[in-house]
Design a protein with these regions (language model features):
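N-terminal nicking endonuclease/strand-transfer module with a His-rich metal-binding environment
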Residues: 1-355
């Protein structure tokens, strides 16, 4: 019974209760729990967009091939490495979706990026994507892919034709994307990489990664200086108003989303610990070892802070806020770039940021 209860807890911790998966047996769940608790590398699979029309698709493949400088490989295993070969492939794909052959706003291709963190061998990523694409799309859809190594994290751009050989079109849903992450993680493990595909929440992470657009804005480029994004500036001003209201004695604003995150994390962490307790009661030494790994994993999880909590803590530290002196809080009418640091003052009382 302990293993059955352990399985139930692991499923809950991995947010699998309502999702149909491949081969979700106890052995597989325990193996997943082991990889997660060991800190296995997490894969990234993302749909970046869809191609509509020959011109759009040609531009996308030109980018993926770096205008013929990066080789493309297709679903038949054919590799195109010369600029002439690559240009011919791009031209062929583009002409197939000329305007007179398609409906308006029709999605012709799906664009995906499959990525691994810095330090993973790029060729292993490419090999895993080759196996993944063949398994997921190879029977019914044409595709091409290209490995990019111009950034620290190796990644592959995969372009798939939406229309299948059987006349049906791809219609990817959220569950499909999650299954594809699982499939890619398995393909990476076949390459010798300890990889997993679990939700951020199952690992105790509540913040979404910063979007590429915001990173680009704040980093700047050849034509734009680094600057704070409007999204971040507005979030800061919203938190400033909240702090001012609390200093003036107003009750904190109840945020339903924060409460939901906190409750979910309590449930997930409780489920992990429940699994650890059940595994500890089994006679199998490997289960007892896994129990200890899970307990250490939960103990090392980050504090349950949302992005708003982090902004609030950062502003409190930045301005050394005194409860009795609301004047040190910048005015709500200011932009974030106009805010100036006030003189140092007495540290504020610690506040519970998890409510």
């Amino acid at each position: 019974m302990s293993l059955i209860r352990a399985e139930e807890n692991i499923r809950q911790a991995l947010l699998l209760e309502d999702i149909r998966r491949k081969a979700n047996k106890t052995k597989n769940l325990r193996a997943t729990a082991g990889r997660v608790s060991r800190g296995a590398t997490e894969v990234m699979v993302k749909i970046t967009g869809f191609g509509k029309g020959g011109g759009h698709i040609k531009a996308h493949l030109d980018y993926n091939s770096r205008n013929g400088k990066v080789e493309l490989e297709n679903d038949r295993g054919e590799v195109f490495s010369s600029q002439e070969e690559i240009k011919e492939v791009v031209k062929e794909w583009g002409s197939e979706f000329s305007d007179h052959k398609r409906r308006q706003n029709q999605r012709d291709t799906m664009h995906m990026v499959l990525s691994m963190p810095e330090g993973v061998e790029p060729e292993s990523v490419k090999n895993a994507v080759r196996d993944f694409a063949k398994d997921v799309f190879g029977k019914n859809h044409e595709y091409v892919f290209a490995l990019h190594t111009d950034e620290l994290h190796p990644h592959v751009h995969l372009t798939v034709k939406m229309l299948g050989h059987d006349g049906n079109r791809l219609n990817p849903r959220k569950d499909d994307l999650r299954q594809w992450r699982d499939d890619f993680a398995l393909a990476m493990r076949d390459q010798g990489v300890d990889a997993e595909a679990t939700p951020r929440a199952s690992r105790g992470i509540v913040k979404k990664p910063e979007s590429q657009v915001i990173r680009h804005i704040e980093k700047g480029d050849k034509t734009h200086k680094p600057r704070k994004s409007k999204v971040k500036a507005l979030k800061e001003l919203e938190v400033i108003e909240e702090i001012k209201a609390e200093i003036n004695g107003q009750p904190p604003v109840e945020r339903v989303w924060d409460k939901m995150i906190l409750q979910q994390q309590r449930t997930i962490r409780g489920a992990w610990l429940g699994a650890a307790n059940e595994l500890r009661e089994t006679p199998d030494p490997s289960d007892k070892n896994l129990s200890g790994d899970i307990q250490s994993f939960v103990a090392a999880m980050p504090k349950i802070d949302t992005e708003r909590h982090e902004i609030k803590a950062r502003l409190i530290e930045r301005f050394s806020i005194q409860r009795e002196n609301a004047q040190v809080i910048p005015g709500a009418g200011q932009t974030a770039n106009q805010i100036e640091t006030s003189p140092k003052s007495k540290e504020p009382e610690s506040k519970d940021l998890e409510r």
